[in-house]
Amino acid sequence: MEWSGEASVMALQRHGESAVILTVLSRETGLIRGLVPGGASAKRAAMLQPGNRVSLRWRARLEEQLGTFAVEPARARPGLLGSGDALAGVNAVTALLTFALPERDPHPRLADATEALLDLMDAGEGWAEAYLHWEMRLLDELGFGLDLTSCAVTGAREGLAYVSPRSGRAVSAQAAGEWAPRLLPLPAMLGGRGNGGIEDALALTGHFLQVRLAEAHAGKPLPPARARLVARLTASRHASGW
């Protein structure tokens, strides 16, 4: 069995004296792992940083085997290591993907969205909202998407203010009535009437990541890297006023 193409590094794990087990994300394969002989060397360390783009050839005798990678650099993203926020961002993205996705299950749209987000993080400008919409894409790709386009009760597209914590559907302020305290607020950033910032929008996606995604994985908690990113983005917003 053989596959070749480009992918972005998601994770690596030391294996033996000098090898690593590399996990990458590509449009064609989804997440795929392979052994990289000599991958633990200082020479290859920079190339195999999470978020970097690499050119790969994967080979295995049988499809179900781990296989080995021959790896060459394709495009580095040095900006991911250039700031604490960007580093926290790539750590959250790679941790969520390796937590959520089964191996060798292609999600081309999610892979494209991930590449675009990593490019924004590398450039270092205005990627917080893009990260929020990336989480929405992740939920959608895994079958847990939110429907924030119309009210679940009346069908109205105006005056949306809440989200049902169970169905993930929007609810208008008028339709919510006495149930409003039991619903989640829908921030303006996601088309609602709320005034909250990025932390409120991420609290909404975080609820569904935990309830739907984590519980689908035997109740395992979400990777701590996400909480660290949310804390940094919240602090940055309060410091800068965005």
Swiss-Prot record:
Gene3D superfamilies: Nucleic acid-binding proteins, Recombination protein O, C-terminal domain
Keyword field: DNA damage, DNA recombination, DNA repair
Cellular component, GO, one term: bacterial nucleoid
GO biological process, one term: DNA recombination
Alphabetized InterPro entries for the sequence: ARFGAP/RecO (IPR037278), DNA_rep/recomb_RecO_N (IPR022572), NA-bd_OB-fold (IPR012340), RecO (IPR003717), RecO_C (IPR042242)
Pfam families in UniProt: RecO_C, RecO_N
Keyword Cell membrane annotated: no
Disulphide bond pairs: none
UniProt function note: Involved in DNA repair and RecF pathway recombination.
Cited NCBIfam families: reco
PANTHER family: DNA REPAIR PROTEIN RECO (PTHR33991:SF1)
Entry's family note: Belongs to the RecO family.
Name of the protein in its database record: DNA repair protein RecO
Taxonomic path: Bacteria, Pseudomonadati, Pseudomonadota, Alphaproteobacteria, Rhodobacterales
Protein's gene: recO
